[in-house]
Amino acid sequence: MTATRLSVMTAVLAGLLSTGSVLAQHEGHEGHAGHDQAPAAKTPARVGDAYPFATCPISGKQLGTMGDPVVKVYDGREVRYCCGGCPKKFEKHLQQSLAKLDEKIAADQGPIYPLKTSLVTGKDLPEKPFEFVYGNRLIRLGAEQERAEFAKAPAKYLATLDQAVVGAQGKGYPLKECPVSGEKYGGDMGDPIDLVVAGRLVRVCCKDCKKDVEKDPAKFIGLVDAARKGEKPATHEGHEQHKGQEGHGGKDAGHGHE
């Protein structure tokens, strides 16, 4: 009888120990579950302007024809692609790809560059200034040595460049209405807001419209360029078009006046 009772007690204890071991292992796995899930990668912050062109730098296709553009940021530099397959091709030889993009930006923004002086020193630019692209903006300096000074406060110098663009293009600005909404400047929306995109002044009627320009900068660059050449601008979307989408006064608007 004693032997039987000892056997039963031994079996019960063994069962309890086994159950405790299983529970401990299960808790251990739960504790490690969080470790298996890597934290979501943060999108690098963009510096300067959005990607200014309407086409993919790899395929040459119009952005948006294959769905929403794929956006990548390289050391603060934004590039947009037509599809998910193009970034790998661009990144295979990243420096060469960026250099090619720099050439395109310099060719595009060079003719409308507003300053004849170095952005850093304020001295007259030489016949062949030192040029580079920062944050998708063309920068001209008197000499390469000035680039180190620019790097200390790039936001400050970009703001100075923006002011120069507004000063150079503001007086003869070709549009009388906001290119996004079609609202006349200075109406119920108040004073217009001056944006600088890829070296162009883009004047909008309100803060809501800034986000539309940010979403598709090439579209509005094209509208301003066409108007400057005397061409009739394309039909604007209008504020009513944005109601219920992104904005202008809609009840479920994604953004409103700040």
Where do the language-model regions lie?
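Bacterial N-terminal signal peptides that target proteins for export
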Residues: M1-T10
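Intrinsically disordered, low-complexity terminal tails/loops enriched in metal-binding residues
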Residues: L6, G15-E258
